[in-house]
A protein has these predicted regions:
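A short, N-terminal "cap"/entry segment at the start of jelly-roll beta-barrel domains
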Residues: 1-32, 116-117
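Ligand-binding loop in jelly-roll beta-barrel domains
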Residues: 84-110
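Conserved hydrophobic/aromatic beta-strand scaffold that supports enzyme active sites
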Residues: 33-35, 54, 79-81, 102
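Histidine-centered catalytic micro-motifs
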Residues: 44-51, 86
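Short acidic-glycine-tyrosine-enriched beta hairpin
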Residues: 38, 68-85
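Glycine- and acidic-residue-biased ligand/ion/polar-headgroup-sensing regions
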Residues: 49-68
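Short beta-strand segments in beta-sandwich/barrel cores
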Residues: 43-44, 61-65, 79
């Protein structure tokens, strides 16, 4: 038995709704890693991403809902590849705080996220 175990979480070229991811943006590469905590009952406002991003749910669960109402719930230990260019929001419908680490593959000063109505 090895002392090191590698467990793939995600290996895809599609977002969680099955849409193909766009090409990486031109310009100076910029990688951003964020840690977020969403309390039970809290809802992240409707927004859209201009760059590819993916994350791992460390604790709790998060339901992500697209502007068309398509939704998927991600639980602790699962990877999520976010929608790019499509308005969506996240909501913690669980009973404990959700903790997530998100990785963004951007370029230059491109915004990671923008509000959407």
């Amino acid at each position: 038995m090895s002392d090191i175990e590698i467990i793939p979480l995600v290996d895809t070229s599609e977002s969680w709704d099955g849409e193909r991811l766009p090409a990486y943006p031109a310009g100076t590469p910029r990688v951003t890693i964020l840690r977020g905590v969403v309390q039970p009952g809290a809802k992240v406002a409707m927004h859209r991403h201009g760059v590819i991003n993916a994350g791992v749910i460390l604790r709790g669960e998060l339901t992500v809902v697209s502007e068309t109402g398509v939704e998927r719930t991600f639980r602790a230990g699962e990877g999520v590849v976010e929608l790019v260019g499509t308005p969506h929001y996240g909501e913690n419908r669980g009973r404990e705080a959700t903790e997530v680490i998100m990785f963004y593959a951007g370029a230059g000063n491109l915004p990671l996220s923008e509000p959407s109505e």
